[in-house]
Amino acid sequence: MFCDDCHTLVLAGEIVDFSFRGISLMTDLMALVAGFILDLIFGDPHWLPHPICLIGNLVGFLDKKLRSLLGANKAALLFGGAVLVVSVIFVSFTVPYYILQLAGKINPMLAWTLETLMCYQIFATKCLKDESMQVYYSLLENDIPKARTKLSWIVGRDTQELSAEEIIKGAVETVAENTADGIIAPMFYMFIGGAPLAFLYKSINTMDSMVGYKNDTYLYFGRCAAKMDDLANLIPARITGIAMIFASAICGYNFANAWKIFWRDRYNHLSPNSAMSESVAAGALNIQLGGDHYYFGKLVHKKTIGDNIRSVEPEDIKRVNRILYATAVICLVAFILVYYFVCSVILRSDIA
């Protein structure tokens, strides 16, 4: 149980102190769980200001300013990209950190409430499901142009000429990939360092989505952001892949094939992390994902992921969303169990 000051955990009659920045690590965990539940219920209302948009605005501002100052010199662009990354992650971590520290000094419950709201806005579970289902409903209406438009909101590839099959694959791929980027990775960093560390992660992820491209504009300037994103997702992507395999079994999909394709195709992507979850989705649903796509008008060659056991269908979008939700719950429960295991180990060592 918890002590009244929200700074300690009572296990077996012993008090264990886990206080951090004026609030407790237990408070972080409680905020994580509460924020996750709020996200499942409310998602991201369009009228509510979103902190990730503020991070995006900061990235856009620094992007234009730095590139205008640096010109076309490769070394200067590499350095400028590093300056961008350091500046954005510094702001993204320190602002919520000191807000929570100040709130914790005023009242621990105020700090918990603020961190819960932060965690809620960081998660993207319901938003990802809702946006991908807009693609699904457009396909059911046989409105391919509308489906292309809806897909363009959640993918980076060119969607103007995509067929219905390619639209479905794009939606399945982005749900699978963003299961890691939008839910499990933020959850992982919240578990380690609360909302501030999760905001730091989201800032890296946002920079990668805005400047981490291998095109003429960002090949050098965006390299640091892209590499940082690869590093930040290294562990969460693999946690997501493993959890998705178990989620596929819970959802009644092809567990054995999910494991097989994960093990075989988990590196079949230009990113070292993206295929970790996409391979599981392909295997669980008995479909083939990946392949070549156009980005900013240029053809990008990609390996395929999975076997073409059957043709894709709109229902696959609903199926991958079920895997998304099951994966999120599995990871949430796993992190809670890890927390209590660590607490019990520390308690036993202190008693000894």
Feature locations, PLM:
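Hydrophobic alpha-helical transmembrane segments
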Residues: 3, 12-200, 204, 212-352
